[in-house]
Amino acid sequence: MPIRIDKKLPAVEILRTENIFVMDDQRAAHQDIRPLKILILNLMPQKMVTETQLLRHLANTPLQLDIDFLYMESHRSKTTRSEHMETFYKTFPEVKDEYFDGMIITGAPVEHLPFEEVDYWEEFTQVLEWSKTHVYSTLHICWGAQAGLYLRYGVEKYQMDSKLSGIYPQDTLKEGHLLFRGFDDSYVSPHSRHTEISKEEILNKTNLEILSEGPQVGVSILASRDLREIYSFGHLEYDRDTLAKEYFRDCDAGLAPHIPENYFKDDDVNQTPCLCWSSSAALFFSNWVNYAVYQETPFDWRKIEDDASAYGYL
């Protein structure tokens, strides 16, 4: 949150170089504040679990957030009751005339399919195109990140030899970057995926900044310089037991999965899994809401031209 102090105070310039939001009396007197509108496109099969995970982190900010959930009409969920979807979710036609300060696009268990073979792909592409002029900052997670990069830049996804599953170290690459304010030089987070993207393609096909990476996970988080596009291939939102549930699910399905790395003590699946990423997750989501959304979006969306260039969209 911003702090209001005398603009002549010597500390002001130091704080500003550290990306701490400082305002003087004149700006504070004219500050327009409204609830921030956040849209969550939930593509995960266990809708209610993902809802809780994301809302837990979004609720950490003192800002008021108005949350809407979006689902793909062209896909019927097999694991969430239709009554839940009809009660708590909206369709794209119901939101397409609205403007949102931020949007989160979750992962989805469809990595094994070419993008174009996903049953809701056409509808998904419509949402992503619409977001250019109706959403200020979009946070893409896991498959949502891969799909976003493919649609916007033609970056492909590639099958890995085996599933990447576990808690992995990553280094922050841009000291002082707003999304990583409060982070140490390195952090850990869960990853759970069968596919990856090429760092070379990111460098050759996009002008995005790579913000974190690790030896096992490769590129982890990248973003546009204006923070309107953010791509995260990990799952900072995951609960302590999420990877465990995925592991036992795959065991029950006869898939013979590897034990998630750096997760169970001594690789003993009867032990309680470690939880060592919650502080990083809290920081990341708070930084996204504060720096990419709250401090950047206009008070009145209607004053923005209905054109991506009005936002400096990259």
Swiss-Prot record:
CDD domains: GATase1_HTS
Broad class of enzyme this protein falls into: transferase
Organism: Streptococcus pneumoniae (strain Taiwan19F-14)
Gene responsible for this protein: metAA
One biological process term in Gene Ontology: L-methionine biosynthetic process from homoserine via O-succinyl-L-homoserine and cystathionine
InterPro entries: Class_I_gatase-like, HST_MetA, MetA_family
UniProt keyword annotation of ATP-binding present: no
Similarity remark: Belongs to the MetA family.
EC number(s) reported in the record: 2.3.1.31
Reactions that this protein is recorded to catalyse: L-homoserine + acetyl-CoA = O-acetyl-L-homoserine + CoA
Keyword Translocase: no
Function recorded in the entry: Transfers an acetyl group from acetyl-CoA to L-homoserine, forming acetyl-L-homoserine.
GO molecular function per UniProt: homoserine O-acetyltransferase activity; homoserine O-succinyltransferase activity
Pathway stated in the Swiss-Prot or TrEMBL entry: Amino-acid biosynthesis; L-methionine biosynthesis via de novo pathway; O-acetyl-L-homoserine from L-homoserine: step 1/1
Subcellular location: Cytoplasm
Gene3D superfamilies reported for this sequence: 3.40.50.880
Pfam families the record matches: HTS
A GO-annotated cellular component: cytoplasm
UniProt site positions, description: Important for acyl-CoA specificity: E111
Disulfide bridge partners, by residue number: none
Record-marked site positions (Important for substrate specificity): S192
Protein name per its UniProtKB record: Homoserine O-acetyltransferase
Domain of life (superkingdom): Bacteria
Keywords: Acyltransferase, Amino-acid biosynthesis, Cytoplasm, Methionine biosynthesis, Transferase
Active site: C142, H235, E237
Residues that coordinate or bind substrate: K163, S192, R249
